[in-house]
Amino acid sequence: MVRQPEPDNLFSPLQRGVAAVRSPSVMRKPVSLLAALLLTTDFASGAIETPKNQPIEITSTGQTTYENGLATARDNVAIHIGDTDIYSDFAQYNSQKHEVFVEGHVRIYRDVNLYVGERAVYNIDTKQIRAEEMRSQYDPYFVSGTKISSISENAYLVQNGMFTTHDTPDPSFHLRAHTVRVYENNYVVFQNVTFYVGRVPIFWWPYVYQSLNDAFSFSISPAFLSSWGPSLLTQVAFPITDKIKGRLRLDYRTRRGPAIGFEANIDYGKDDSSWAKLKTYYIQDQNPLINRTSVPRGLVSTGRYRVSLEDKTNFTDDVYAIVDTTKLSDPFVMQDFYQGEFRIDPVPDSVVSVAKTDPFYTLTAIARFRVNEFFEQTERLPEVVLDIKRHALFGGPIFYEGETGIADLHRNFADGSGFENYSTIRLDTFHQLVYPNTYFGWLSVVPRVGFRETYYGETRDLGKTLFTPSDNPLVPDFLLPDPTAAKPIKDGGSTYRTVVNAGVEASFKMSREWEDAQSRFLGLDGLRHIIQPFTNFSWVSESGPDPKEILQFDRFEPSTQLRPIDFPQFTSIDSIDHWTVWRVGVRNRLQTRRDDLTVSWLDLETYVDVNFDNPYDRTPYSNLFNKLRFTPLPWAALVINSQLPALDKGFTEVNTNIVVQPVANVQLSIGHRYLNQNPFFNNSSLFVVGAYYRVNDNWGVGVQEQYEATIRTLEEQRYSVYRDLTSWVASLGAVIRDNGGVKEYGVLLTFTLKAFPKFGFDFNFDPGSSGN
């Protein structure tokens, strides 16, 4: 509801886009001035018409007159013309000047903007407003002044203006300017402007430009990080064109020096369906060898930079191209200045691809190349793949799927690593037939059979070289050391490899319901148990060269999880060996009703591999896997993903996460990651504990602890306090990190403007965690 403003020059709570609706009194007792005007000779042919042929409708509940070209109305006056609606206590329309004078509780709605004041003059031809002590809203901003006049159809000059985003008569902050020029949905220009917090002046500017475009934002971030020292990070985002939005970064770090960056987001193409993102950054680093980790570094130059480009171009509805590339000055620039991105992607990729999609196939051409010589990269220069999607052959019960590709592959090791690069041409084609069917109305059986043929232009000549395989059954025999200058790869010439695969999947479901299973404490309103046993038998025969002779590109990668045993889901083409594996398991699901919906109360999936012949796990049985998710109540959840060597030798992994919100203002979380005796990863027993307490409407506190028990190290501590400042949200926190014996300390202080979160002062003492 829009509250009536007080007559003094204060800000009033306003709503954006409120529809113009006649007051109840107008609807109860309408007296139409339009009807009276129709009886005069000047308007005998119809309604009042403006030069633009827009009729004016004036209604009120009081006296209405029309004399000498002046139409007057009193009490609950409502005027409607085009996209403009005007409400007041008194109104007078001059048919010669085409102006409406309104007085008393004036409200002018035009498009989605609202103007509120005591008196105003509105020109129906130019749509200009002249007023004193008027207030207006341009979401999320509020503007007022002692005098407002139009300087164009969508632009206004405000004298002695005030500007804020705080929706209250007494804003906690505002800008007061001698003059304010407002250009609707575009920008605002202030002259001789002072920034106030409450009634206290804080800062003065002779001139301020403020965009109303959602692409505009700014932040000033005093920052501290152990490796930076006291710093000032600033960034301004602004629209360059309607399709291009830019961001300029100007930073200074006392231990590092000045830095500059530019970023751009571009929308283009049909319906703006294509886009591009550019990121650039350069710093003249005064201390490039500063290292707050325990990992030693080599020589790093002082001129450090990153240039990144992401792009997706939609040429047609079924043809598109993707570009993703990053050029870095050194291997540590992302770790030092873009810690948020570094934690997600420490080794940026460089790929260009073009794809043609179809309901039956996808044709993709990929070029993957190395632009940073200090990183290892498997290049594809290029690779072209035709992927045939599973579909029925000639409309029958048998389905076909396959993929065929050719690739020029190069494995390039990091410069200075001591390893020797290698390459080959690979032609690979895979074809498979599938016969899904349901028997007895409940048993799903899906047999499959396929073959793969692969050509390699280069192989490894093992000769008389002996390699000692690992005695760990979880390490494949064909994993050989990477080539070095002392032990280079001997060319074994070209070769062909044939792979035949067959298998069958089967599953069925059973269910039972218990309507009398009722428990408010456990969140039960009836219970349904669904059990689904499943099995997957996979047989693969490989004939051709010894798998050790195959040069590795799409290769075996260490993982704690079971690998796919089906094609084409198994993508490590160069690590294919013969295997016979039977995967068997059961899914249990308990469902209940909640808010008239069926929800999962408990899910448990249990499975194990029987390894008749498995090159990736030479034990008779894999670990026993259990995936549990228990959600007894909307505010409580337990997730446990575990694998245990229950049937044979192996390793142990248990990941546990508990989240509860017992009352509305308290949330607790406990996580534990346990890993033991895996041959590829270090043992770990990591505890992560977090809590948040909302003290009241204005205060909140949070804490998070991360402890690695195997090395008895408290790796990270975070403590924070949150304060709601009505129109701002402030947070104060402390951070302590142990980077392998080298500790970092920081304090975090941020202010976020609730009405427009992109604007604010960011006192950010942990910039890495916020993505800077």
Predicted regions and their residues:
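Serine residues within intrinsically disordered or low-complexity segments
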Residues: 12, 23-25, 32
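N-terminal start and proteolytic maturation junction detector
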Residues: 12-13, 41
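Ala/Thr-enriched low-complexity intrinsically disordered regions
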Residues: 19-20, 40-44
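Charged (often Lys/Glu-rich) extended helix/loop segments that serve as interaction or gating elements
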Residues: 47-164
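Outer-membrane beta-barrel proteins and related beta-barrel translocases across Gram-negative bacteria
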Residues: 113-130, 136-157, 161-163, 168-179, ...
